[in-house]
Amino acid sequence: MSNLATVTPIKPHLEVVEHRVAELDDGYTRTANTLLEAVMLSGLTQHQLLIVMAVWRKTYGYNKKIDWIGNEQFAELTGMAPTKCSTAKNELIRMGVLTQVGRQVGMNKNISEWKTKVNGFGKTFTRSVKLTFTKSVKTNLPNQSNTKDNIQKTINTNTPLPPKGGCDEGSKPEKRKPTKINYSEYLAAYNEIVGDRLPHAVEVNSERQRKLKKLIDSLATKNIDGFRAYVKAFMAAARPFHFGDNDRDWVANFDYLLRPKVLIAIREGTL
């Protein structure tokens, strides 16, 4: 007689899956709609937007206006590295979106103080160039109709005569005298704009004169006004790294702004 085999049924492994559902009973954050809409229109970067939301969570989420929030807390809430959290937070403070009192930060509800797109400070490069280009093209384009007639009318059939009292050959245009640069004025303008945030420039040596002259020739407005605009643009675009927030204790200075690549970075928005 054959032995009967015992068959044990195999049951599938059942794992309990928890479905997480957001509920107001678990807590909520009250935010003014005007503030929310202003943030959405401000053109903030992803890192900056995450920091704003983290500040809301740690302040408005606990019915506070301001609180101390460490970089580690920001990192836990946003998933970013603490150093990136610090950089984005400092950028928002400089832009006036966040306020800082000591080590505490909070949201600046006075939207008119923000230096962002919502106030017109951040008009995009593409749009501004497009408007300028369109206007200049409409102004400067010649009338293209009746091209054949226009060409014939512009042909001068008269024999050109030499100017009275002068010679028609060998005359050369008078050379323009180069504008003398007051280098001390440029250093003073730089020191005034950077204030106490960057080291001041004192000495006007030959190397600085040479580099400054080259920089001025590269500016759109080749005078002290163009230089002041350049320094102001740098201060607005500079990151905490440029003000000493780095491992080397390095800070930007007057000679750093004389570098051609810094001017290019300011123009292209890649500083």
Swiss-Prot record:
Organism domain of life: Viruses
Q: Which InterPro entries match?
A: Phage_lambda_VrpO_N, WH-like_DNA-bd_sf
Biased composition of type Polar residues is found at 141-159
Q: Where is this region: Disordered?
A: 141-178
Write the record's keywords in alphabetical order, separated by commas.
DNA replication, Early protein
Question: Is Cell membrane given among the entry's keywords?
Answer: no
GO BP term, example = DNA replication
KW Zinc (keyword) present: no
So what family is this one in?
Belongs to the phage O protein family.
Protein name, please? DNA replication protein gp18
User: What organism, scientifically named, is this protein from?
Assistant: Salmonella phage P22 (Bacteriophage P22)
